Amino acid sequence: MVHATACSEIIRAEVAELLGVRADALHPGANLVGQGLDSIRMMSLVGRWRRKGIAVDFATLAATPTIEAWSQLVSAGTGVAPTAVAAPGDAGLSQEGEPFPLAPMQHAMWVGRHDHQQLGGVAGHLYVEFDGARVDPDRLRAAATRLALRHPMLRVQFLPDGTQRIPPAAGSRDFPISVADLRHVAPDVVDQRLAGIRDAKSHQQLDGAVFELALTLLPGERTRLHVDLDMQAADAMSYRILLADLAALYDGREPPALGYTYREYRQAIEAEETLPQPVRDADRDWWAQRIPQLPDPPALPTRAGGERDRRRSTRRWHWLDPQTRDALFARARARGITPAMTLAAAFANVLARWSASSRFLLNLPLFSRQALHPDVDLLVGDFTSSLLLDVDLTGARTAAARAQAVQEALRSAAGHSAYPGLSVLRDLSRHRGTQVLAPVVFTSALGLGDLFCPDVTEQFGTPGWIISQGPQVLLDAQVTEFDGGVLVNWDVREGVFAPGVIDAMFTHQVDELLRLAAGDDAWDAPSPSALPAAQRAVRAALNGRTAAPSTEALHDGFFRQAQQQPDAPAVFASSGDLSYAQLRDQASAVAAALRAAGLRVGDTVAVLGPKTGEQVAAVLGILAAGGVYLPIGVDQPRDRAERILATGSVNLALVCGPPCQVRVPVPTLLLADVLAAAPAEFVPGPSDPTALAYVLFTSGSTGEPKGVEVAHDAAMNTVETFIRHFELGAADRWLALATLECDMSVLDIFAALRSGGAIVVVDEAQRRDPDAWARLIDTYEVTALNFMPGWLDMLLEVGGGRLSSLRAVAVGGDWVRPDLARRLQVQAPSARFAGLGGATETAVHATIFEVQDAANLPPDWASVPYGVPFPNNACRVVADSGDDCPDWVAGELWVSGRGIARGYRGRPELTAERFVEHDGRTWYRTGDLARYWHDGTLEFVGRADHRVKISGYRVELGEIEAALQRLPGVHAAAATVLPGGSDVLAAAVCVDDAGVTAESIRQQLADLVPAHMIPRHVTLLDRIPFTDSGKIDRAEVGALLAAEVERSGDRSAPYAAPRTVLQRALRRIVADILGRANDAVGVHDDFFALGGDSVLATQVVAGIRRWLDSPSLMVADMFAARTIAALAQLLTGREANADRLELVAEVYLEIANMTSADVMAALDPIEQPAQPAFKPWVKRFTGTDKPGAVLVFPHAGGAAAAYRWLAKSLVANDVDTFVVQYPQRADRRSHPAADSIEALALELFEAGDWHLTAPLTLFGHCMGAIVAFEFARLAERNGVPVRALWASSGQAPSTVAASGPLPTADRDVLADMVDLGGTDPVLLEDEEFVELLVPAVKADYRALSGYSCPPDVRIRANIHAVGGNRDHRISREMLTSWETHTSGRFTLSHFDGGHFYLNDHLDAVARMVSADVR
């Protein structure tokens, strides 16, 4: 154990070195944070001490940041032995020029740059422009050349298998630098050319190179140096080193020589990681306990459409001058907060304000170089790791509280950083069953020195343009020391985010930093609103719109119209039409009867029964008598109706239609009796607009219905706005579809009658029949509709030219799809169309948006917006914190003003919860999720109670539905979670394009939403079911989807067995790498849902490339395919010969299931002790001990292994089989080629004691048929019986010489092989494969070119010629010529196929040959 005093001096020296101060300036008891030590440098100390074997952790150091406390910790922790690290030269490490593994962050960037990756298709990239004077191109080129020799990573190559290779230096070759001379070009042209260069370079993916320099010579002896770096090769710290070294070399100064390389560093790290890692293991366990509770990344507002380039980054920056920086950091340190965490907290605050939650994952890159060699700090390469912060700002209302929260999150995570953030992300992905990204990044380079050292700016000029980007990164907030201050900048994929969002966010962060630097009070005061002043002004203007109220009750307008136009039609109904006078008389009769029954002003009257025209008179009479109406429809279950009667404090009941079955505990009147009685005189008294008008019961989240109390004046605001907006009057006729229980009926009745129009009543028998609605519209020339979206959808389906009279159509109460407006315009060209937002608690509607050009609505709209508040109403969109959400940020919609309800009848607690006070006024919390557009338009994005958890993510079903409805050909959609307690997401979709399939929908949806939001099950329906009130019937949708999934046997992605050999092989590879049993991996299971990640995907791809001979497979393919079935389809689609992969897969499976002894025996079966009579290159496949065998002769260039499958088929038919190996290939590669066909046949004949296996049946393909013929001649001369020769796709011996010489040049040989079709052209592009193949083919071609045979040479054995009917090289006539070479029997057979027909007909050919053997 090290003594504490000595330890204290060592620690003081190390800390002083990090801070750049003298050791004696640091008091042992002083808070080191206050002295300038930040979190990043503290973490570097932890890493340094751990490598020395000192057991300390970041959290403990951060809790007591003094030299005194650390001395005690370090002296107590020195008993741990340091971990041994393998030296670079240890055995097993790759040598220079050989591939070596990517570092974890390099691998993440390599995977993420592929197009198929979520947020991929982008390289890690840093581009800088330096504006200076007189940079000399030749000096720059010479300096860059020496720089590339000094830093091998500038020559690195990233290989397709996920490794990297540094090729040897190219000797004296100059580093390429492009020079553009614009010195004599007009200024406007100069600007144009510079802009073009910037546009091209700032977002390019460097092809092959990782470092690019370009120089532009400008007028006035000015220059612009363009520096472009692929950050997969070098991290941000390495960038500083590169530029500093380049500046020194340019100035003629040689940096100190390097005795160590990045490759050696990575090999040492890899070796270290093979040793026991107890700290890493403990940290992994710590993270594993927290994985289930980790939050999502910040859900920032994104752009719905794809019209902007989502890959290009833009930059926002602000420079904190030295005075501001010093003031900010001093105030932070005084509170025990490091500068880096102060800046991080300001960023986190912005993320919380502009995202859906105040708790989120934040990604922090760390720059960590292990001191394995004195030169490590001078190397160029990737030394980064990452840290995931679980940031929770819930309840942190002040800047100080937020900074403390972020700092605590850092301490907690950094204390367990031995298990890096990338590994945590992969574990989180496995836990959730989908790829999880951390695309919002905070990068702190504080403590690393100035971004550009003075030497760089002196040599090359001022950095005038900087931009960086990274794969799978949306927003990278960076802080770095620059020009004596701090540069705060964001590199952001602008096209991903909603317009104006990034500007507002960045401005808010800068404002906060300046506020905190300006004074201490700002740290502890409640934070100002995130709502920018301009946005606040827009909303205030819309919320401030007013219209003078009429001060009348709902029914007053009707009675005035009855006096002014008594004979005008008021109601058209199946029960009889009524004029205004007749309707007034009926209403008066109802009022008189109610009064006679004891009704007092303010009493509540229940209206029960089916929908009829008489109900209009009923509600008018109740209101005229001073009562409040409470409707209960016939669809209500008896128990619920009775609960409503009890909860509703009903005083009287009025039954429309026949007596109801509901037990009514109050005096009851039958409407039919009231209207049949003698007319009663009744004069309405003065009305009170503040009195209650009606109580409507709606569904409650607890299952208990809640009664909404609405006053006359609140409803009148909606009625008056409606009439005013659509300019409704006496000529209008309204289709009254809504039942009295539905708040839409308020407008149907009172807006129509107040404006002097007429109501066309849809009665109970018609209200579920859209064709009846269309007939009524056509018959009565209806002009106005007040509909739910579902009703309009059904009406438009059956309209059939009957809707042309419509001129005002208002739709609300649920998602209003844009296609409704488009379809309506076709059938009712004169109709105005508006979408409305609101609830029963907002007196039907509270907002309105009129569609001006239905045919040209933006294609990315998922719904018609809610619009703007009615006059006298106001709206807010409120975050969970209670703050106003900025534009594009979703929050709960609150409504205030004249048009809101009074509360819930008999539910004071619920009323207090939903009707809240803020800024001196009452607001109704709708439960709707909405967001503001930049112009103050409100957009409905879903319901708070439709949020669900999928794979650990909080998901809004409305967002999924919106994305589905943006897809081409999708007419309507509803998403749900399947019942039964699962988190299986499913969707019902209606399409208007027969080409749209469930799978195509899922594939297209992947471009719009992350993987966890793609429904696992998509079912195509003819129509989305709606409730009677016109809303999506989500219960019915869920039941339909569950039934469909149950019917298809696909409840929750169950196991699906492989159906092909290739699928079995792929399953074996995937299962082995995932560490799962074979039967735990189905062919439709998502690889990433099974726990796969980018690292494991790379291993799978490497395995497939190696074991299944599929060199074209890339990691991006794995991310695109995701399932074994899709991967098999992809691989097969790339094959010229689809059966080849099946054959290769069968070999792999056979080997994978063998023991080591089995493998050795299979690789060389003839070397078994029981078979001493044959050369080892004669491959035997034992099928039987019976006499007789088949001997197979390959084609030119062919190896014995190519006929393994024919041999297996013959063995399956109980036939002993041998396949001979020619020289110059496989295990005979070193054997000299035969000079002639005869010599080759003799060598093969002498390779075994063929008497032991006689009689022989010979099978030769192409050239092999000629070799077999000469073998047969030798056998017959030597007394070895030959039963038959099967000549497959080969010329007859007597015709070979006339064919002329075969090609001998490599290129011609390869072309001939492609023409024959037996070799995959992809393989012929592989240099190593060609090197192995061509010598064998050329040797065979030479032998065959010198062969000749007279036509009268015969063998006694039968000859059976076989070929393909589409073989363009060997015709039927050529095969027939074989008949002249036998004195025995001759047959000719053809199969469908080309020259290598055999691959498609192995079993059939084997059966024919086998039959001949016996």
Curated annotation (Swiss-Prot):
Induction record: The first gene in the probable mtbB-mtbC-mtbD-mtbE-mtbF-mtbG-mtbH operon. Induced by iron starvation conditions and during infection of human THP-1 macrophages. Transcriptionally repressed by IdeR and iron. Induced 27-fold by iron starvation (0.02 ug Fe/ml versus 8 ug Fe/ml). Probably transcriptionally activated by HupB; deletion of hupB decreases induction 10-fold.
| Domain Carrier: residue ranges | 5-78, 1057-1135
Cite the cofactor comment: Binds 2 phosphopantetheines covalently.
User: Which Pfam families does this chain map to?
Assistant: AMP-binding, AMP-binding_C, Condensation, PP-binding, Thioesterase
Spell out the residue ranges making up region: Condensation/cyclization.
Answer: 96-394
Start and end residues of each stretch annotated as Thioesterase: 1188-1413
Species? Mycobacterium tuberculosis (strain ATCC 25618 / H37Rv)
What does the entry note on its domains? Answer: Modular protein that contains an aryl carrier protein (ArCP) domain which bears a phosphopantetheinyl arm to attach the activated salicylic acid, a condensation/cyclization domain involved in the formation of the oxazoline ring, an adenylation domain which activates the serine or threonine residue into an aminoacyl-AMP ester, a peptidyl carrier protein (PCP) domain which bears a phosphopantetheinyl arm to attach the activated serine or threonine, and a terminal thioesterase domain which assists in the transfer of intermediates from MbtB to ACP1 in MbtD.
A single BP term in Gene Ontology: secondary metabolite biosynthetic process
Region of interest (Adenylation), residue spans: 579-975
Top EC group? ligase
The pathway to which it is assigned is: Siderophore biosynthesis; mycobactin biosynthesis
What's the Enzyme Commission number for this chain?
6.3.2.-
Which residues are recorded as modified (O-(pantetheine 4'-phosphoryl)serine)? S39, S1094
For this entry, the protein name equals Phenyloxazoline synthase MbtB
Q: Which SMART domains does the UniProt record give?
A: PKS_PP
